[in-house]
UniProtKB/Swiss-Prot annotation:
This is PTS system lactose-specific EIICB component. Its main location: membrane. Keywords: Cell membrane, Kinase, Membrane, Phosphoprotein, Phosphotransferase system, Sugar transport, Transferase, Transmembrane, Transmembrane helix, Transport. InterPro entries: LacE, PTS_EIIB-like_sf, PTS_EIIB_2/3, PTS_EIIB_3, PTS_EIIC, PTS_EIIC_3, PTS_IIB, PTS_Sugar-EIIC/EIIB. The phosphoenolpyruvate-dependent sugar phosphotransferase system (sugar PTS), a major carbohydrate active transport system, catalyzes the phosphorylation of incoming sugar substrates concomitantly with their translocation across the cell membrane. The enzyme II LacEF PTS system is involved in lactose transport. The lineage of its organism: Bacteria, Bacillati, Bacillota, Bacilli, Bacillales.
């Protein structure tokens, strides 16, 4: 029964993979990744300014203003900045389809998108200048609009050579200025015209109009059905081999960051912060220890199973999973594509967000009002993100207990199967391992498990003799770090001239030319055809990995070195 259900879900995989590679969704995601230092930096000052309130201490107004200035001057302009970073990412995607001698200037598109955004989101101040009310999270949807219009117009002009052409004698940097003049002017005229139409028709700026238009959707998304569908999709997509965040995160990005600011404003006013859909909810409630709410799973594998293999996988997975990097348990067990774990893998995140919503609406716990790094351990993220209240400790403990209850019966069934294999009563399920390997890049997890003695593969010496720089890419940089670390450790141990670095897909365009090989982790393997256009143009080798394969490579440094060598032999 479960096998048939999974097979039906997998039939939609090609469509959802195509959706995850959509250049506009990717531009939104990568635009936020580029702006993440601003978002995280600003949250530090929120914590300093308002966490002491929990313990009865309040800064005086002057000191509060000093502490809040870094927040207001960074997060308060985040939409303005994201307009530029989103335009840059989208420009990179369009440039892949253009001739290398006729590319769109991403610096120009960034400037045009940011200038255009000001027309759409700012109002004139009485004493000159302009107001910034919609330049923060309230203006994110408008930032996307400005970025998309900008790059589409630039692409139209550059592709058709609608530019001012200068004599060959003119230096390239001067010639580029005139080449950008027509598309830049067209963007500003179009967005200014839109601004005039909206202001005269609805007596508001475009950003305010868009916010009012989508307000019912934001409200509905925060309801029981909304959070169930949105956060259930994360785990469902991941289970069948699709990187769910690539689809879901861009669609809800504006809601999550707007809700964070709304919650903060409510707390400032002494009211209850009740917005559910936030980045903190996603990272510390729904993906509590990684997609599938797997924080408890490695501990359960260690302490609640009888199989030697399961115990070893649990021990190897505990530390990375505690910090939100759960590939070792996802692909090492495996949990993904494993019919036994389908129900708990999808159900646990949904139940977690239901419990959180009950705590917010019934018990009065404040929802998340600050952005924290995704590698913050789940329980600590809950406590810090919700203001260190007593109920936050209770919530963290409750989620741990509930997730154990959800996973326990399925773990016992799976452990029984593995025990039968170990004792020779049942043949090893190589089909499942091969299926995971075919759908996920498991190198990172393999490396971790190998280092812990889980892998049976013998290592072989590497024949790499020339300096080789390797870039490992995953969705956010955490998973890729496992393989990069395994490569660097093995290279040092065996004196092989390999240097590896980890990165997030989308933030790689400006650095990829420094590497001879790029390896895609399973999370981003579906982007292989897109990035291959870039690597072929630059003469860089490209390799993608699958789930079980990636885990194996992260366990075994020598195997990872062999994998690198094989890419240059093929």
């Amino acid at each position: 029964m479960m096998q048939k259900l999974i097979a039906q879900i997998e039939k939609g995989k090609p469509f959802f993979e195509k959706l995850s590679r959509n250049i506009y969704l990717r531009a939104i995601r990568d635009g936020f990744i580029s702006a993440m230092p601003v978002i995280l930096f600003s949250s530090i000052f929120l914590l300093i300014a308002y966490v002491p309130n929990i313990f009865g201490f309040k800064w005086d107004k002057g000191m509060e203003a000093i502490l809040m200035k870094p927040y207001n001057y960074t997060m308060g302009l985040v939409a303005f900045l994201v307009a530029g970073t989103t335009a840059k990412s989208l420009t990179d995607s369009f440039n892949r389809k253009l001739e290398s001698t006729n590319q769109i200037n991403f610096i120009s598109t960034m400037l045009a998108a940011m200038c255009g955004f000001l027309f759409l989101a700012s109002d004139p101040a009485k004493d000159g200048g302009f107001l910034s009310a919609f330049m923060g999270t309230k203006g994110l949807l408008t930032a996307f609009l400005s970025a998309f219009v900008t790059v589409i117009v630039y692409n139209f002009c550059v592709k058709r050579n609608i530019t001012i052409k200068m004599p060959k004698e003119v230096p390239p940097n001067i010639s580029q200025v005139f080449k950008d003049l027509i598309p830049f002017s067209a963007v500003i005229i179009i967005l200014y015209a839109l601004d005039l139409v909206i202001r005269n028709s609805f007596k508001s700026n475009v950003a305010e109009g868009i916010l009012k238009l989508f307000e019912p959707l934001f409200t509905a998304a925060d309801g029981w059905i909304g959070v169930t569908i949105i956060f259930g999709a994360f785990a469902l997509f991941w289970f069948v081999g699709i990187h769910g965040p690539s689809i879901v995160e861009p669609a809800i990005a504006a809601i999550t960051y707007a809700n964070i600011e709304a919650n903060f404003k409510l707390l400032q006013a002494g009211e209850h912060a009740d917005k559910i859909i936030t980045s903190g909810t996603q990272m510390f409630i729904v993906t509590f220890g990684g997609t599938g709410a797997t924080l408890v799973v490695p501990f359960m594998f260690m302490w609640m199973t009888k199989s030697k293999r399961n115990k070893a996988i649990g021990r190897a997975s505990v530390v990375p999973t505690f910090f939100g990097v759960n590939e070792p348990i996802l692909f090492g067990a495996p949990l993904v594509l494993n019919p036994v774990f389908f129900i708990p893998f999808v159900l646990a995140p949904i139940v977690n967000v239901w419990i959180f919503k009950l705590f917010v609406e019934v018990l009065g716990i404040n929802s998340f009002s600050v952005n924290l790094p995704w590698t913050t351990p789940g329980p600590l993220g809950i406590i810090m993100g919700t203001g260190f209240g007593l109920w936050s400790f209770v919530l963290a403990i409750t989620l741990i207990v509930v997730d154990i209850i959800i996973y326990y019966p399925f773990l016992k069934v799976y452990d029984s199967e593995i025990l039968d294999e170990e004792e020779g009563r049942k043949e090893s399920n190589s089909d499942l391992k091969e299926k995971v390997a075919a759908n996920f890049d498991t190198k990172k997890a393999d490396s971790i498990l190998a280092a812990s003695g889980v892998s049976d593969d013998a290592a072989k010496a590497s024949n790499i003799t020339e300096q080789t720089n390797v870039l490992v890419l995953c969705a956010g940089g955490g998973t890729s770090g496992l393989l990069a670390n395994a490569l660097n450790k093995a290279a040092e141990e065996y004196h092989v001239p390999v240097k590896a670095a980890a990165g997030g897909y989308g933030a790689h365009m400006d650095i990829m030319k420094e590497y001879q090989l790029i390896i895609l982790a399973p999370q981003v393997a579906s982007n292989y055809e897109d990035i291959k256009q870039d690597t072929d143009r630059l003469g860089i080798k490209l390799a993608k990995t699958q789930g079980a394969e990636y885990i194996k490579l992260t366990r075994d440094g020598q195997a990872a070195l062999d994998f690198v060598q094989q890419q240059f032999e093929n």
